[in-house]
Amino acid sequence: MHHSGPLLKRRGGQNREGIMADNTNDKLPAKDTTVMEPVIDKHYQLIETKRAEEIIERAMNLAREQIPKGKVATYIPELGKMDPHQLGICLYPLKGDKICLGDYDTRFTIQSVSKVIMLIVALEVCGLKAVFRKVGMEPSGEAFDSLVELDVSNSKPYNPLINSGALAVCGLLLPEVSFQDMIRYTRNVCSDMGIELNEAVFDSEMKACSRNRSIAYLLESKGIITTDVEDTLRFYTKMCSMNVTAESLANLGKKLANDGVCNIDGKRYMSSRTARIAKTLMLTCGMYDGSGTFAIKVGIPTKSGVGGGLLSVSDKRAGIGVFGPALDAQGNSIAGCKLLREISNELRLNLFYDPEWDKEDAEETVLKDMQARSVM
């Protein structure tokens, strides 16, 4: 079992401070009272908060136009009851005021965004080698609940941000931590003591989890899951059924952006290495089989969930949380992705920012490049 000093507190274990310590009675980090500090973009040009708000408002209006093209998730009956027209965002810069617009404080279930939290805790409690013995680090190119890679002899899940990989991570975590440990840590890292298990969604998901159950038993047959399969499945489903807000996710994103440290109270919530691994996998694998397109067009490490949530990290700059339950064909928030693309371009948050992308779509740019090469 991996140990990394004062960060850890194992289940039922020592009375030492750690990421799993019971801090539910701690005060939330003090509100950032800085007035009109600038948002800092990739090129360190100063953008006043008021201007950033105007940019995000315009982006929200453009994003809302995409909502009719999406649909809420219906394979989980409770999620099918969500209002597809909701849209909210919270952008929390390391320097400057938190910007919250729309339905940013509406509670929704975290769903697959929780895979980032599972990965963080697994890396801290079990260690890098133990985690990546169970799962890979590669994009899958398949749907989030795909069984394809598991059909290959001696294979393991491609990465921890798809269902099979997250189930494998849960099997690794379950002997060490309980769900109560996990929800406690989630409240702390999201600076949101209002996070609770949504029992109705949990029950609905457990009744509709035939595919995840198949994945879990297949993982057991390969020796990847060694804990009780049904216990592992319940643990995983509970993690997906926690109620959060866009603001909760922005709080988490901000700590990831600052390499695991809250810049207000100075508390470390994960090691810098864990934060780096999480951000890297979010960029390459966080949007399922839409990850490559999203990385090119938006260029911000992001993890999506079928509840409509998006957790985004602009490294060293800001955490972003988005809520928009109308989904595209890949199961990602259709308005949320458009919103992130717009603000990524306008605020220069794209890791690979290219001003030409402001002028024309990626497909046209690539086509022109190919035509230019053929002429030459």
Residue ranges and their predicted role:
Residues 96, 109-132, 252, 320:
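Active-site SXXK
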Residues 35-70, 122-239:
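Active-site-adjacent helix/loop patches that line small-molecule binding or acyl-intermediate pockets
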Residues 4-19:
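Short, Lys/Arg-enriched N-terminal segments with co-localized hydrophobic residues
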Residues 28-45, 60, 259-291, 295-376:
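Structured C-terminal helix/loop/strand segments within mature extracytoplasmic catalytic/sensor domains
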Residues 79-82, 157-159, 207, 299-303, ...:
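Short Gly/Pro-enriched turn/cap motifs at secondary-structure boundaries
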Residues 64-101, 311-312:
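A short, well-structured edge-of-sheet supersecondary motif
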